[in-house]
């Protein structure tokens, strides 16, 4: 045996083994460095510490998990574990493993038209949310994920350049969606996926959480594959009261689910975050606020209007302007005002900060019918807002200044055919229309107006009760419970005459309440008939004889009513045989 050859062979084997171990060590070190770097990137989002290796293992083994509430895409909110987002493809990704959960499991119905709405604007085709699907094994071939350790709420802002949309479509829905889920607390992070920049009022969104909101474009700077360890996607629509006319002309929603109580709680939360307090004013220090616009839809005789208001109501008048004052300063002023006067516009959403008993006065340019544009009237009229509302419209064409030469989105019409321009100029009122580019609507709404003070003051005198903020109290909205122990007795007086006596006990909660007026509603229906006879009664028993027939079966329902309009539930039906 050649000893040198054997030794050389052994040496080569040892060196090869050492090199292999070195390469594995370098790879392992590189992997650790990469994971450390990705951990650092993940923690750039948050102070929350993350076990990167544990998170990656959870994603690889368990995949994505989704559980949703709501039956339709228009009312669905989904909770995800390890929902990912590919910043290059601009797509959300659901990774499947044997442990994945997808409820509801809709199959291809998920695309008809979408899993859910990302904004609170219902069924708008620019606001749909869906995801792509991949097996978890595909992670081996993809960039290493960067994990977002915060609980996140993922949504679209609808129009962050417009105050009405910011409050109605974004802030209120986000606030109450966060109230709905306990882990969407002050430490949660908002993620805006609509693709807009911050916008002029981004500070308002910052008030909802202690964490800086993330924009879609910012996600690209953190990595190619972002994975949200725990996220909620979508918004509650329960707080919205207005639809913008995408399918039918704009107006109040058919089924409004929010009251002034919830609006005022949200307004108080926002004021607290802005460090605004509602200080008690002196009895004689009520004042009127006039919203001043500086670029379009101007009040041309603003000084005269201020003087007329001061003389009519014997109050001082002040002006506020979004262009000239900070938002929190404006809210501080409005929150103690007796009246808010403004041309129609997004700034009127600030009326939600008015004290109870205050008045909202909305002015409309020539040709614009106030009954067709009512977001602020609807807000003021919500039960529990306790605001008075009056609308004034300019009916004098000589008191309007038009701008046909402006760009189309500022009301210009010179780009239209001459015949169409002439029709718009001759029109006395904008016909009902869909959103959002109706040229006649834009032409009229961007006019400047000289307010006819005589008609303006007449409208205020007719429409407003005496302004008295100090006595404005929260109206009770407590509903009665079911009446207790309902009973019926019958008797036959003759072959064609019978009596039906009904009695009951008061609702259980009534003994704990102070109610001005308590009445009872009784419905009587002959079995087999489609119609019934309703009765409103002041007492807890009554004997009916009119239209009561012998040897007949009657169905009887009873309920309690507080203060004429607070209806309780019906008690179980009584079956009464004469």
Swiss-Prot record:
Annotated localization: Endoplasmic reticulum membrane
Cytoplasmic compartment residues: 1-4
Protein name: Protein O-linked-mannose beta-1,4-N-acetylglucosaminyltransferase 2
One Pfam family per UniProt: Glyco_transf_61
Gene3D superfamilies according to UniProt: Immunoglobulins
Gene: pomgnt2
Known EC number: 2.4.1.312
Sequence ranges on the Lumenal membrane side: 26-578
UniProtKB keywords: Endoplasmic reticulum, Glycoprotein, Glycosyltransferase, Membrane, Signal-anchor, Transferase, Transmembrane, Transmembrane helix
Pathway named in the protein's UniProt entry: Protein modification; protein glycosylation
InterPro entries: FN3_dom, FN3_sf, Glyco_transf_61_cat, Glycosyltransferase_61, Ig-like_fold
Span of the signal peptide: none
Similarity comment: Belongs to the glycosyltransferase 61 family.
Keyword Cytoplasm: no
Domain Fibronectin type-III: 482-578
A biological-process GO annotation: retina development in camera-type eye
Record lineage: Eukaryota, Metazoa, Chordata, Craniata, Vertebrata
Topology in membrane: Single-pass type II membrane protein
């Amino acid at each position: 045996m050649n000893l040198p050859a054997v030794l050389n062979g052994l040496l080569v084997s040892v060196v090869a083994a050492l090199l292999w171990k070195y390469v594995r060590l370098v790879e392992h070190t590189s992997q650790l460095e990469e994971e450390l770097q990705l951990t650092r990137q993940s923690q750039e989002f948050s102070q929350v510490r993350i076990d990167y290796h544990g998170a990656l293992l959870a994603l690889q083994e368990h995949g994505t998990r989704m559980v949703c509430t709501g039956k339709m895409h228009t009312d669905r909110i989904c909770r995800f574990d390890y929902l990912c987002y590919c910043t290059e493809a601009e797509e959300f990704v659901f990774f499947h493993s044997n442990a994945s959960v997808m409820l509801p499991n809709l199959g291809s119905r998920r695309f008809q038209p979408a899993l859910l709405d990302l904004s609170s604007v219902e069924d708008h085709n620019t606001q749909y949310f869906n995801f792509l699907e991949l097996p978890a094994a595909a992670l081996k071939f993809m960039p290493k994920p960067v994990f977002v350790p915060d609980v996140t709420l993922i949504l679209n802002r609808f129009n962050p350049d417009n105050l009405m949309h910011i409050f109605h479509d974004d802030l209120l829905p986000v606030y109450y969606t966060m109230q709905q889920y306990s882990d969407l607390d002050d430490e949660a992070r908002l993620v805006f996926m609509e693709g807009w920049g911050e916008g002029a009022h981004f500070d308002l969104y910052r008030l909802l959480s202690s964490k800086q909101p993330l924009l879609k474009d910012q996600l690209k700077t953190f990595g190619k594959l972002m994975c949200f360890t725990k996220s909620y996607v979508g918004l509650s629509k329960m707080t919205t009261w207005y639809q913008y006319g995408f399918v039918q002309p704009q107006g109040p929603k058919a089924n409004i689910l929010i009251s002034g109580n919830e609006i005022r709680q949200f307004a108080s939360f926002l004021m607290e975050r802005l460090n605004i307090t509602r200080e008690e004013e002196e009895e004689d220090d009520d004042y009127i606020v006039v919203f001043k616009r500086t670029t379009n839809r101007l009040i041309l005789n603003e000084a005269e209007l201020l003087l007329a208001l001061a003389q009519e109501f014997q109050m001082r008048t002040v002006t506020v302007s979004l262009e000239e004052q900070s938002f929190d300063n404006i809210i501080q002023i409005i929150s103690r005002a007796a009246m808010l006067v403004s041309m129609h516009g997004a700034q009127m959403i600030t009326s939600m900060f008015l004290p109870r008993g205050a008045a909202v006065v909305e002015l409309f340019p020539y040709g614009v019918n106030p009954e067709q544009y009512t977001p602020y009237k609807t807000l003021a009229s919500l039960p529990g807002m306790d605001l008075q509302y009056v609308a004034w419209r300019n009916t004098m064409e000589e008191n309007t200044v038009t701008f046909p030469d402006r760009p189309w989105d500022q009301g210009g019409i010179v780009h239209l055919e001459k015949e169409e321009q002439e029709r718009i100029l001759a029109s006395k009122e904008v016909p009902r229309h869909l959103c959002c580019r109706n040229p006649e609507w834009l032409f009229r709404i961007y006019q400047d107006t000289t307010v006819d003070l005589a008609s303006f003051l007449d409208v205020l005198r007719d429409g407003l009760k005496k302004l008295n903020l100090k006595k404005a109290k929260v109206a009770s909205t407590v509903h009665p419970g079911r009446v207790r122990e309902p009973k019926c007795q019958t008797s036959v007086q003759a072959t064609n005459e019978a009596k039906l006596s009904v009695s009951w006990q008061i609702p259980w909660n009534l003994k704990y309440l102070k109610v001005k007026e308590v009445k009872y509603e009784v419905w009587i229906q002959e079995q087999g008939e489609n119609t019934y006879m309703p009765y409103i009664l002041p007492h807890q028993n009554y004997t009916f004889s009119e239209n009561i027939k012998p040897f007949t079966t009657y169905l009887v329902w009873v309920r309690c009513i507080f203060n004429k309009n607070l209806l309780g539930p019906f008690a179980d039906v009584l079956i009464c045989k004469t």
